[in-house]
């Protein structure tokens, strides 16, 4: 009997890079993880690790009883003691729970944390979205400064850039403060009531519970109705408007492309004030690569003090899918092609010398013919093939083939000469 992976999941494995999806390639995972970890270090963030399952009530309290996560997507189970637990559908709630449980609010504020790990949502499988997906995220707790918002957006943008995502634009909105919502929500609710018969069932249910979330509807009829709805930007309090201006000025100062999107609300109930999405047109209609926002009441909601927070999450699968549209970096710097048995040991010595200088190299250990070795060099995604045979050994050089152009040239000077030719 044979077994297959569960629906909505995938494997990461060494294979034919040209045939694999980006998220199936361990080399791309490693590159993204290393780049993100280095950026977090440079921005002053410390790693936090929380369990992959928590009390289910934690996610109900944080994301909201009416959120799609709670109503449709959580993997919920009971342990032997009868406690209701859930596989984590997102990262923020667990990090905030840890912040409160361990008294991190007693430390010098803000506390800046990052995480990397699997999340679980029982949702319809589609390109770049899975029931188990891996998220890179960051949370900053203990500061309401708008420049913190700018830093968080800049960090997300930098991670995506380091992975090769291009043409990215930040969509930005502000969901206001208590004063803003006191003025805006009744107006929006009255508008929705007038169009109740034209809305999808989920949006009708949200009229009372959280009318702002109707802007998150994917139903075409509802979206058509909402094009005429009042927008929150017209109702922002002076304080909320000033916060938004400061964030915009910060993004402009850093040269980060953004647009105001007054219909952007995000899909979780805990968001307040700043919300944002990083979008890239290379993904088509489902163009969001990462997103986040402020949750200034969540810490208190989960039993802690009145402490503001902001964060983001970005799916590894979405990032790698978006990055594929850019010119990908080669997975391998050099593949050594040996034309005779006598060339194998010198090839190994050269490869080891290049590895010591930081280059990635491979040799043939499967006894392939020279033609088969060239095919393997092509499949591996190597930038160059380094050819060694009797002529090269007797002449004290190697033949370097550019795998993209097919151009060949002789390279002498031993390991140093080869390093200069490959690395520049």
UniProtKB/Swiss-Prot annotation:
State the top-level EC class: ligase
Q: Where does it reside?
A: Cytoplasm
Q: What is this protein called?
A: Histidine--tRNA ligase
Q: Name one GO cellular component term.
A: cytoplasm
What family is this?
Belongs to the class-II aminoacyl-tRNA synthetase family.
Which GO molecular function entries does the Swiss-Prot or TrEMBL record give? ATP binding; histidine-tRNA ligase activity
Instruction: Describe the subunit structure.
Output: Homodimer.
Q: EC number(s) for this protein?
A: 6.1.1.21
Q: Does the keyword Ligase apply?
A: yes
Q: Which PROSITE patterns match?
A: AA_TRNA_LIGASE_II (PS50862)
What's an example GO BP annotation here? histidyl-tRNA aminoacylation
Q: Say which domain of life the source belongs to.
A: Bacteria
Locate the region Disordered: 1-22
| Catalysis performed (reactions) | tRNA(His) + L-histidine + ATP = L-histidyl-tRNA(His) + AMP + diphosphate + H(+)
What organism is this sequence from? Rubrobacter xylanophilus (strain DSM 9941 / JCM 11954 / NBRC 16129 / PRD-1)
Keywords of the record, alphabetical order, are:
Aminoacyl-tRNA synthetase, ATP-binding, Cytoplasm, Ligase, Nucleotide-binding, Protein biosynthesis
């Amino acid at each position: 009997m044979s077994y297959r992976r569960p629906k909505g999941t995938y494997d990461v494995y060494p294979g034919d890079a040209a045939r694999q999806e980006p998220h199936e390639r361990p080399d791309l995972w490693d590159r993204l993880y290393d780049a993100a970890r280095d950026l977090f270090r440079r921005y002053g963030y410390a790693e936090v690790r929380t369990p992959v399952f928590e009390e289910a009530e934690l996610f109900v309290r944080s994301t909201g009883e009416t959120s799609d996560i709670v109503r449709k997507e959580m993997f919920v189970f009971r342990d032997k003691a009868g406690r209701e637990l859930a596989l984590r559908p997102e990262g923020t709630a667990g990090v905030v729970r840890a912040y409160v449980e361990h008294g991190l609010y007693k430390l010098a504020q803000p506390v800046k944390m990052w995480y990397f790990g699997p999340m679980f949502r029982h949702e319809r499988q589609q390109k770049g979205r899975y029931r188990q997906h891996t998220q890179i995220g960051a949370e900053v707790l203990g500061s309401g400064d708008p420049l913190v918002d700018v830093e968080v957006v800049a960090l997300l943008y930098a991670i995506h850039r380091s992975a090769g995502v291009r043409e990215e634009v930040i969509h930005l909105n502000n969901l206001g403060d208590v004063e803003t919502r006191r003025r805006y929500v009744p107006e929006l609710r009255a508008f929705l009531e007038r169009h109740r018969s034209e809305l999808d069932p989920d949006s009708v249910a949200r009229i009372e519970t959280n009318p702002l979330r109707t802007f998150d509807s994917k139903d075409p009829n509802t979206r058509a109705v909402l094009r005429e709805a009042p927008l929150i930007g017209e109702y922002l309090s002076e304080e909320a408007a000033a916060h938004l201006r400061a964030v915009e000025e910060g993004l402009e100062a850093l040269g980060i492309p953004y647009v105001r999107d007054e219909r952007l609300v995000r899909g979780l109930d805990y968001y307040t004030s700043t919300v944002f999405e990083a979008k890239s047109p290379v993904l088509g209609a489902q163009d969001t690569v990462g997103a986040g926002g402020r949750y200034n009441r969540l810490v208190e909601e989960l039993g802690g003090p009145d402490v503001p927070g902001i964060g983001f999450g970005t799916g590894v699968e979405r990032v790698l899918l978006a990055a594929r549209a850019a010119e990908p970096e080669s997975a391998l710097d050099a593949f050594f092609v040996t034309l005779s048995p006598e060339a194998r040991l010198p090839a190994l010595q050269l490869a080891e010398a290049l590895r010591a200088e930081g280059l990635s190299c491979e040799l043939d250990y499967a006894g392939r013919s020279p033609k088969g070795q060239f095919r393997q060099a092509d499949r591996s995604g190597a930038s160059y093939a380094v050819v060694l045979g009797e002529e090269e050994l007797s002449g004290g050089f190697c033949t370097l083939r550019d795998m993209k152009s097919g151009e060949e040239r002789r390279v002498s000077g031993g390991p140093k000469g080869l390093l200069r030719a490959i690395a520049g």
